[in-house]
Regions:
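Soluble, non-transmembrane alpha-helical interaction regions
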Residues: 8-114
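C-terminal segment of classical bacterial N-terminal signal peptides
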Residues: 1-7
Length: 114
């Protein structure tokens, strides 16, 4: 998210008033960026919730196992599966954020605010 700081720095360096078209262009770029980030979050949170609910049910079921060795192996597998699911959801969300910021930087340059 380094783009946020560079965009802010660029805004502070500018002098004078901007025309309405430029202001609207930047506002649209902001909307596009933030809506893309929100869509990434809309995908992430249900995936994270499902991963946690799956882990919860699986762990409870594992604790019905009376054999300690089998239970230990099952629990290890459950945690590994949860870790992979949670990581996949986070990676997808971060990827969406990265794409949104790159597109914002490109869109903002097109607006040419000085």
């Amino acid at each position: 998210m380094g783009g946020a700081y560079s965009a802010l720095a660029k805004e502070k360096k500018g002098k004078g008033a901007l025309d309405t078209a430029t202001l609207l262009c930047v506002q649209k770029a902001i909307d596009n960026r933030d809506n893309a980030i929100l869509m990434g979050l809309d995908v992430y949170y249900p995936a994270a919730k499902t991963a946690l609910q799956t882990r919860q049910a699986a762990l409870k079921n594992a604790w019905t196992q009376t054999d300690q060795k089998i239970r230990k192996d099952v629990i290890k597998t459950i945690w590994k599966s949860y870790k992979n699911s949670a990581k996949s959801a986070r990676t997808a969300m971060k990827g969406a954020q990265k794409v949104a910021w790159k597109k914002f930087e490109a869109d903002r340059k097109v607006c040419n605010p000085k």
